[in-house]
């Protein structure tokens, strides 16, 4: 594979490299078999391989031969096959074939992604999860419209094959991919036989297909957004009484009236910013309502025409930040005006100026969090704490640890907000629910539990607040923490409540369009 990388670096015609012979290399399947063993041992036990079973490369080659001899006309119109290649029980041989196919296809993909993003400049880091936080802090306050789009998981197999065909010149290497995709589609339990649903599982094959599909969408979309957001540079121009504008000459475009020779100068800022996290993509736009409306209709049409993919209207939601709050990452996102008092001293005179700046202000959604806690039986719909009956069979330490973990995750997750006072209400609900759960377990009252356990009741639980009161966190540090936000890069994975709340928000939007 290193030879393919060197070949792609030296020769620009790396698309014509032949990948099909790699499917018959035994070393390739040895690597894929090791990947399968490592993944199985780390996640779940292997049920289909015993200690006496030996991996046979001849069986793998027979499976590849079966792929070559398949009748594609039967695969297209028959729902099931008596000898499926994609085993739903996840056998070692079918997984090795998928791993080997993934390793082969990753060779040109890695070369293409490496040399295609070099010319994208500031757009090259929009795929990283770490880019979402600079986007919110730097780009979000300077935008007046935000569009949130859900990237669908339902993809037709032929769309995936044609996506690979655009940058792989070796057509025979795509026949195994087409056969496996159609057979997986036919063996699926979904009633929609015309599409393939890429599952959200940690399978290297499906993750590679999903990442390649999203990369193809973004590589075209971002280039169009970049082209539309940057104007043509001009070499000269006259500005009477505005000589300080000569530094902004590159952000100026010129257009002429049809019936007049007078030229009109206008400023144009780079006003479109894009970022993606998970299955959601955010586009922040600074412009008029007409411009936002055009982009809202352009994005679904772009996906329909280029990828033959239908986007429902509720998948593209645009919000005006001055009037509404957008929901993302489990926060209510808004922009508020922040007054600043600037004092300037020149010689013996003191000048005071009042400035107003836009500041990004994420809000903790207290009411939705209480609604989710009520669904998990920690409180009722009004926020009144109740006992967690399903945890009464656990030990006292386990109960305290579980409540402690919930509160720690919530406080850690919403540390990116200034106003965390509403979290104390959540703390009250969890602490009282913990006390009621212990009282229900010991068949007593909350007063008796507090009297018996005393300060030991919450010694292990809800320790995050005590960490802020500890000596390393002085009063000045605590006051500074109220004025500063701390974004943690692991928040998209640690809080299932945020994902559940996002699903509820999506369902509400879908119901509005169904009415």
Swiss-Prot record:
InterPro entries: Domain_X (IPR024937), Maturase_MatK (IPR002866), Maturase_MatK_N (IPR024942). GO terms for molecular function: RNA binding. GO terms for cellular component: chloroplast. Keywords: Chloroplast, mRNA processing, Plastid, RNA-binding, tRNA processing. Its main location: plastid. The keyword Secreted does not apply. Transmembrane segments: none annotated. One of its GO terms (biological process) is mRNA processing. It is found in: Plastid, Chloroplast. Usually encoded in the trnK tRNA gene intron. Probably assists in splicing its own and other chloroplast group II introns. Belongs to the intron maturase 2 family. MatK subfamily. This is Maturase K. The lineage of its organism: Eukaryota, Viridiplantae, Streptophyta, Embryophyta, Tracheophyta.
């Amino acid at each position: 594979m290193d030879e393919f990388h060197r070949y792609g670096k030296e020769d620009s015609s790396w698309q014509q490299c032949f990948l099909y012979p790699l499917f018959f290399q035994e070393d390739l399947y040895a690597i894929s078999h090791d990947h399968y063993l490592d993944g199985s041992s780390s996640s779940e036990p292997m049920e289909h391989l015993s200690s006496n079973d030996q991996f046979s490369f001849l069986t793998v080659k027979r499976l590849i031969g079966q792929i070559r001899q398949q009748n594609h006309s039967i695969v297209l119109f028959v729902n099931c096959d008596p000898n499926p290649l994609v085993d739903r029980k996840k056998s070692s041989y079918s997984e090795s074939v998928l791993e080997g196919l993934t390793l082969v296809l990753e060779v040109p993909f890695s070369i293409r992604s490496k040399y295609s993003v070099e010319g994208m400049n500031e757009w090259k880091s929009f795929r990283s999860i770490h880019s979402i936080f600079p986007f919110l802090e730097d780009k979000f306050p300077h935008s007046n419209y935000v569009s949130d789009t859900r990237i669908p998981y339902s993809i037709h197999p032929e769309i995936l094959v044609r996506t690979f065909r655009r940058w792989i010149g070796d057509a025979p290497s795509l026949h195994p991919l087409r056969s496996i995709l159609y057979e997986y589609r036919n063996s699926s339990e979904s009633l929609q036989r015309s599409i393939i649903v890429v599952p959200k599982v940690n399978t290297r094959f499906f993750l590679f297909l999903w990442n390649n599909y999203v990369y193809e969408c973004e590589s075209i979309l971002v280039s169009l957004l970049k082209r539309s957001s940057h104007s043509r540079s001009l070499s000269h121009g006259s500005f009477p009484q505005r000589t300080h504008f000569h530094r902004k000459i590159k952000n100026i475009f010129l257009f002429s009236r049809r019936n007049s020779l007078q030229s009109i100068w206008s400023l144009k800022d780079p006003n479109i910013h894009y970022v993606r996290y998970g299955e959601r993509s955010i586009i922040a736009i600074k412009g008029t309502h007409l411009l936002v409306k055009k982009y809202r209709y352009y994005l679904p049409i772009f996906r329909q025409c280029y990828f033959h993919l239908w986007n429902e209207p509720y998948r593209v939601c645009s919000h005006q930040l001055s009037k509404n709050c957008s929901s993302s990452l489990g926060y209510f996102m808004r922009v508020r005006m922040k007054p600043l008092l600037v004092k300037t001293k020149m010689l013996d005179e003191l000048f005071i100026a009042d400035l107003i700046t836009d500041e990004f202000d994420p809000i903790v959604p207290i009411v939705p969090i209480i609604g989710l806690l009520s669904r998990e039986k920690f409180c009722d719909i009004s926020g009144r704490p109740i006992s967690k009956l399903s945890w009464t069979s656990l030990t006292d330490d386990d109960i305290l640890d579980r409540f402690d973990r919930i509160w720690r995750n919530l406080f850690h997750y919403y540390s990116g907000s200034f106003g965390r006072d509403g979290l104390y209400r959540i703390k009250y609900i969890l602490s009282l629910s913990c006390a009621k759960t212990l009282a229900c377990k010991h068949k007593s009252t909350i007063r008796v539990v507090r009297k018996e356990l005393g300060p030991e009741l919450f010694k292990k639980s809800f320790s995050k607040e005590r960490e802020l009161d500890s000596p390393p966190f002085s009063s000045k540090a605590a006051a500074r923490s109220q004025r500063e936000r701390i974004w943690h890069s692991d928040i998209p994975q640690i809080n299932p409540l945020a994902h559940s709340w996002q699903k509820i928000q999506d369902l509400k939007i879908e119901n509005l369009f169904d009415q």
